[in-house]
Structure formats: C-alpha cells, structure tokens
Amino acid sequence: MTELVIMSFAFSRGEPPDANLVFDMRFLRNPHWQEPLRPLTGLDRAVGEYIAGDVAYAEALSRVEALLLTLLPLYQGDGKALVRVAFGCTGGRHRSVHVAEEVAGRLRAAGFSPRLGHRDLAAPPHVGTERSAGNGPEGLGADGC
C-alpha cells in the first residue's frame, strides 16, 4: 500500500525537496492582507471561507482532486511506497494550510488515508509577503503598480 502524505509549506522558506507533486496556491487571494484574518491560519473557519470565496477556488480544487484521484492509483499500481503532495503559499499559514486540509478531507472521502502536516504553520510570519494582483491592498503589486 502506498503511503500518502499531504503537506502545506511556505515558498518563502523553500520548496520541500522530497515532494512528488507541488501545487502553488499563490493565485488565490491572500488573507494576509485582511487585517482581521492576518493573525489567523488556514485552520480557522473565517480564513477558509475567505479563501473559498475566491472565484478560482472551486474549479481549481476540483481539478487538483481529479488529478490526484487519477494519479494516486497509478502510483499504487507502480508499487510506489510513498507519495508526498505539497501545497505552497507565500507564508505557509493561510492558503496552503486550508487547501491541504480540504484536499486531505476529499481524499479521505474517496477512500484514501493521507497523513497531513503543515511544515511552516508554527514558523514566525515573514515580513514582505507578496503583493501581486488581487493579493495586496487595492490589488497593487509589490512595487506599488
């Protein structure tokens, strides 16, 4: 049986070198820029609701789920002992955490038994989180444009 590990991480602290599949969640709107949500994490309901309200969220998660439901049986059939699926965002506290939790839940509902971890959740937040379109105040980029 293939062991399945789902994890979240912060791109600002480096990609996990042993991940088989890495998904970048930085396209989703960033709760960091919402003052009431900033101190919370992707484990908090308010953060999850904010992220799930992004217009790209539902379709993106459905496609990730479909891809994993296609690939995981193939990995198992090939005898792969361990598959690590990593979800990243800038700080590893909001988007990646919520999505990792959501995907793990969906995979459990589909009959898999993923182990779930959040590599950078307890790490102190980084200063200078990205401000790309839709992620910063008024949608400004890091250079204010």
Which positions does each model-derived feature cover?
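Solvent-exposed beta-strand sheet faces enriched in polar/charged residues
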Residues: 7, 86-88, 117
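A generic structural signal for well-ordered alpha-helical surface patches
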Residues: 62, 66-69, 97, 101, ...
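Nucleotide and nucleotide-moiety/phosphate-recognizing core
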Residues: 129
